[in-house]
Amino acid sequence: YYFNFSFKEKNKKVKAEKKQVQSETTIFALPELHFQYDRKANWLQFKSFFFVNFLSIIKSVTFKILFIFSAIILISNLFGGFEYFGLQSYPLTYKLIDLINNASGIFVVIILVFFSGELIWRDRDNKINEVVDATPHQSFISLSAKALSLVGITIILHVFFVFCGVIYQLLNGYTRIELDLYFLDFVYNNLMIYIIWSSVMIMIQVVLNNKYIGYFISIAVIFIWEIILAIFDVQSNMLEIGAGPFLQYSDMNGFGPGLHGAMWFNLYWILFSIICLLIAGALWNRGIISSLKDKFKIAKKQVSKGYKMLIASFVVAWILVAGFVYYNTQVLNTYRTSDEQEI
């Protein structure tokens, strides 16, 4: 006979032995956190915001399409050659600069208008605006990073166009490559305008708090406002956004005597663009506030005295530069419209 051997008595319930685990609690002191909101922290935040916004534009399908179209137009114009009155001309640098400006102008405007709204509304569209708004950072730093990321995109676009122009010059046997002229023309004629437009469009999107109305007003500021001034025969560079004396390069006298006046107009508009960003920083919607009236109420309470003094100092500087420019263009010199100059 076979039987199962067991040390337990039959018909006796076996209770599971519960092992008591002694939990030991370790007590330690939490580390102290020292929050630093200095210039270094502001710079690190600015770089972070800048690269996030910059890369979001670079990766955008819309930007890639606009980039390809602008490149196609430039390359097609280059292969058209430089023929004047039946004579073929060398691809001189200043001629290529005019070609690049004509090919890139409209596409740069589209990029600035479109992505100014995309950068402002990206966090809200992705439902993470309240998380980003709750982080300890200054609104001015965030908005200035958005504006300069737009400027960075225009620089990348222009560098590519210059590269195409230089390759075209070399392929046609022209070796007098004036890279300094490419750079100076971009700084004098284009870069300042892109900075001003980017800042103004960012402010428009912040103040209006509606992406598509902001698009319309941005286009109106660039194109319709100029038409309105022309209708009333007002031709002042102090009223047209980003305007200044026309600079035309020549091999004999460079950019000419108008360069000095153009720099003063650039300073006048750069100060205006900084004021726009400062105002946008004060009115930036951090939270659920939407109406412009509520924004002004909150701004009066939350904006620090130092920030208000900063705005006031830039306004005073802008007024002083405006007075100097007005005195030189309207008082010392006789103001004449284009029609009067033709007579």
Residue spans of the language-model regions?
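Helix-loop-helix units of permease transmembrane domains in multi-pass membrane transporters
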Residues: 117-153
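Terminal transmembrane helical anchor/hairpin motif
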Residues: 1-2, 212-298, 322, 327-338
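Hydrophobic cores of alpha-helical transmembrane segments in multi-pass inner/ER membrane proteins
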Residues: 1, 107-114, 190-200, 267-283
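Hydrophobic alpha-helical transmembrane segments of multi-pass membrane transport/permease proteins
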Residues: 61-83, 103-111, 217-227
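Long, hydrophobic alpha-helical segments
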Residues: 99-122, 126, 157
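Hydrophobic membrane-insertion alpha-helices, especially the h-region
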Residues: 311-325
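Aromatic- and glycine-rich beta-strand/loop motifs that create alpha-glucan
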Residues: 26-67, 288-298
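Secretory targeting signals
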Residues: 78-79, 91-107, 144-209
